[in-house]
């Protein structure tokens, strides 16, 4: 039977041999990871079940053969097994931390029990002056020495643990360029390799815990997550003091509903991920001003999206959106809306309620028309519709009194409404590449006196309207692959101002009842333009 001193010595040795104890933040992070892994596993299994039900319904009409049926059953089980294995892998590191902390708590209890035993033995020895019934030495100094020895060793262990934690905390994740420095015994050694510089799920959760306790206001994880992280931990909602959050350039597929707790968030960057949808709680981010969701896989927006009433800048480009929700009209403070490279077939009529819009980019979609309500966007300055299927513009486009740039190139536009000439602030107008459809410009195009750039390339326009002469500010004019006959191609090649001067001179000539300009008079005009007119006979030109 070991003596009390030997028992204390053995207990102390065992305690010293334990691995480093995880910090509180690490334990909380591990618990958050386990909760997230459970939620992700359940969601993925539900998705597999829905896919199976859909496939079963579609194949019910044509019953598969026995071999095919067995293969499908094997495939379904393989999918479910893959989901469970993925969840197991995600839980592995977190489960170790949680179990490690549980074992440390057991040791804490054992240490306390040992301390109580020694203390009670010491008290009994002092009172009785002899040997206790438990066999411990009862007289005087021996039991006191044992208690002092135990306490001394406990203090030594605690000091060693504190030093270890300080050493770990001094390194943290600073080498990764992150603002917060959580104490983490699970930190990977940062090497020159790109993969080794990224964070595992539990490291992300630990960083969130530490950042939340420090009350940080800005956090960037741009490109910092390992590729295996597709779901963020539910503890993300603890970052309640954060105003700017950058999660871009990762492989995130889903956000936890707890993101709605980030009530002070004003800027959120999620571009270049794999987001399929947004949680309903997303609409609770009522202070959000800047939101970047471009380059994801979004197919729809939640109905709560209209609650983001502070939103000023929204980038939804390069997704898979086929429609925008009607609630978009509630975003009265929205100034910049980018929805390029989606699958939009129409805009909601409520777009007209976004009266603060200054910039609207809809390039590379499947739009066939614009709603008349577009004319209510009185502050709109930029409207781009490049590469859609639009056949005509609404007459209300003339109400866009502040419009400076309009691009309807690569469409199927047949007629440009005369009303567009009331948009007298236009500086840049691109009507190119409507190919066989567009045959004429508005007769009143000369009203656009601020126009500096005009592109009518690859259309079927043959004649410019007389009012073209009023475009005195025009400095760029493109008409490539457009069969212009009037003015002649030679004039167009000389540039925008040459065309304007030609139209002016022609109008003046008509005003003095001169005959219609023919080929000979064109050459006379051309040489007068350069101040080098000579007699036709001297240069051999036709008369």
From Swiss-Prot:
Entry annotated with the keyword Cell membrane: no
Tissue-wise expression: Widely expressed.
Family: Belongs to the SHOC2 family.
InterPro entries with a match to the protein in the record: Leu-rich_rpt, Leu-rich_rpt_typical-subtyp, LRR_dom_sf, LRR_domain-containing
Protein name: Plant intracellular Ras-group-related LRR protein 5
Function comment: Leucine-rich repeat protein that likely mediates protein interactions, possibly in the context of signal transduction.
Entry annotated with the keyword Transferase: no
Domain of life: Eukaryota
């Amino acid at each position: 039977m070991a003596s009390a001193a030997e028992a204390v010595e053995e207990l102390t040795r065992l305690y010293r041999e334990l691995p480093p104890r995880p910090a509180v933040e690490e334990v909380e992070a591990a618990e958050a990871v386990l909760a997230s892994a459970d939620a992700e596993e359940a969601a993925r299994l539900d998705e597999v079940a829905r896919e199976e039900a859909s496939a079963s319904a579609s194949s019910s009409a044509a019953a598969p053969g026995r071999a095919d049926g067995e293969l499908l059953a094997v495939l379904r089980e393989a999918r479910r097994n893959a989901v469970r294995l993925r969840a197991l892998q995600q839980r592995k590191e977190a489960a170790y931390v949680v179990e490690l902390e549980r074992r440390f708590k057991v040791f804490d209890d054992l240490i306390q029990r040992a301390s109580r035993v020694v203390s009670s033995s010491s008290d009994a020895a002092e009172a009785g002056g002899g040997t206790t019934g438990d066999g411990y030495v009862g007289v005087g100094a021996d039991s006191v020495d044992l208690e002092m020895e135990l306490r001394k060793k406990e203090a030594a262990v605690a000091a060693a643990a504190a030093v270890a934690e300080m050493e770990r905390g001094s390194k943290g994740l600073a080498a990764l360029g992150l603002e917060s420095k959580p104490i983490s015994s699970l930190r990977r050694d940062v090497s020159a390799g790109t993969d080794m510089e990224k964070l595992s799920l539990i490291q992300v959760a630990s960083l969130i815990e530490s950042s939340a306790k420090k009350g940080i206001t800005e956090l960037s994880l741009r490109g910092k997550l390992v590729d295996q992280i597709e779901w963020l931990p539910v503890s993300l909602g603890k970052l309640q003091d954060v105003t700017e959050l950058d999660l871009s350039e990762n492989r995130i597929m889903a956000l936890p509903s707890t993101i709605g707790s980030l009530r002070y968030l004003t800027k959120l960057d999620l571009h270049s991920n794999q987001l399929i949808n947004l949680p309903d709680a997303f609409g609770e981010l009522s202070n959000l001003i800047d939101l970047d969701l471009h380059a994801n896989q979004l197919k729809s927006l939640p109905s709560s999206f209209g609650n983001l009433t502070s939103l000023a800048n929204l980038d939804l480009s390069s997704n898979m959106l086929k429609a925008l929700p009607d609630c978009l009209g509630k975003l009265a403070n929205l100034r910049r809306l980018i929805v390029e490279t989606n699958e939009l077939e129409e805009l909601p009529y409520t777009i007209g309620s976004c009266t603060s819009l200054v910039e609207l980019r809809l390039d590379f979609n499947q739009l066939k028309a614009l709603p008349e309500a577009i004319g209510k966007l009185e502050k709109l300055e930029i409207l781009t519709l490049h590469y859609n299927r639009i056949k005509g513009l609404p007459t209300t486009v003339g109400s866009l009194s502040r419009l400076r740039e309009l691009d309807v190139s690569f469409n199927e536009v047949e007629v440009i409404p005369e009303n567009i000439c009331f948009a007298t602030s236009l500086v840049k107008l691109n009507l190119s590449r409507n190919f066989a459809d567009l045959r004429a410009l508005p007769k009143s195009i000369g009203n656009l006196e601020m126009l500096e750039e005009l592109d009518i390339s690859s259309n079927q326009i043959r004649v410019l309207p007389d009012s073209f002469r009023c475009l005195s500010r025009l400095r760029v004019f493109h008409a490539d692959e457009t069969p212009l006959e009037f003015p002649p191609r030679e004039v167009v090649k000389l540039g925008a101002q040459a065309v304007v001067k030609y139209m002016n001179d022609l109008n003046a000539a008509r005003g003095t009842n001169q005959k219609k300009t023919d080929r000979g008079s064109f050459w006379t005009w051309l040489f007068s333009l350069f101040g080098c007119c000579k007699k036709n006979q001297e240069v051999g030109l036709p008369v």
